Amino acid sequence: MPFSLHFETGKVTSQQLYSEIYQGILEGRLRSNERLPSTRMLSKKLGIARNTVISVYERLQFEGWIVKKAGSGTYVSNALEQTVNQDKRSIKHYQLGVFGTNAAKKPEIIAPKNLDYDFTLGVPDHQRIAKHIWRHSRLSRLNALTPEFAHGGDLQGLTCLRESICEYVRHSRGVICDPEDIIITQGCQQAIMTTLLTLLSPGDLVSTEDPGYPVFRNQARLLGAQIGTVPMDDQGVVVESIPSNTKIIYTTPSHQFPLGFSYSVERKLELLRWAEVNNAIIIEDDYDAEYHYLNTSKQALKSQDKNDCVIMIGSFSKILFPGLRIGYMIPPKSLIDPISNMLWHLGRSTSVVSQILLDEFMRDGHFSHHLLNMNKIYSERYHKLTQLIDNIDCLQRIPSQGGLHIAAEVSGCATQMMNKLVSSNVAVYPSSHFSINNHSNALLFGFGIIPTPKIEKAFDIIQSVLD
């Protein structure tokens, strides 16, 4: 027997022996079908009455933990093993609701891993970012907490940060608004979901660019909406193809995801006229608009929104780092309170400390300096990448002016080309993964985290594989 028991004075001997054997079985020190000492041998070893051992064995046998085998002895039963297996077999399943059933349908994620050359999408160069923001930010205001800070701030977010964002979007995106028009969020995904929860009923029709950002489609489908898709041309979303009765359309006018181009001014105005006539809402995801490399900074769709039908959403994850989890939205004035109230019901959890930190960073000028510095770094990668893509005959680069990735149409099957490159240690991504109706056949090259020297080495491989 793999233990020796030292009895404690004042405690019942039989109970101590029972507990030792019982725990030994539960903890695996006494295994299924292991033979136990006879009552005579164990009583002699422990120096206790044989009747005490007999009573303990009888109790354990009654409970099913040990068994007697005639002419053989006493053994640990397999009761524990059966209990564990039974637990595994009898996992109880519950009926999911509509939202739970929809959420169980996980979207496909394409992400080749552990390749030496990865043109991954949507990830900034955090090595240059995280230490920069923490080094230059001060938390001096935490030493003198105002009631707003101490109680979590306004439903729309801290006033001071909304003031800073107000200045930022005015200078960089041409959007004239007041701090009262801005709602702080955890980022674009939360902004989209909150908007949909506020405005949609099951069965409503929403539309999106095709190819386009899958998160919007997935969230709308989760809530029971019908999904309409709208093809793109080189000017932007084809307005005349927007399905009738569309209640909300999701767009990325400044840097279309995933094709990378910007909407023309004429197409923006056409889209705004459509929304006014159809009493529809446009979600403008200001995706990657912070980065532009051809001395052109186009104004946001929201800046031309005279009829208050655009919900502009933005995030600081690409400028700083995703873990900061701060974004913003600028909805029509009539929707500010309903959306803010919905955020409250969802457990508004944008960190007050992070909001203070970001506000300090912006007010002290570090934000604009950092953005300028990152534009220089990304601009070098952008120009090198455009040059290398243009040197490959089977790639036709889609003109873009900024962002953190470039798209190139291919002659042939983009997915097959991707697979060839992945097998050669280079990760690129086909635009078809973001399309419902296969409206696109392009390869996507993200350059947020891949430095220029690695871009050049990767294209040596790409050229040899594709040519």
Model-inferred region functions:
Residues 68, 177, 428:
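Short beta-strand "wing" residues that participate in macromolecule-binding interfaces
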Residues 71, 303-338:
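Active-site PLP attachment segment
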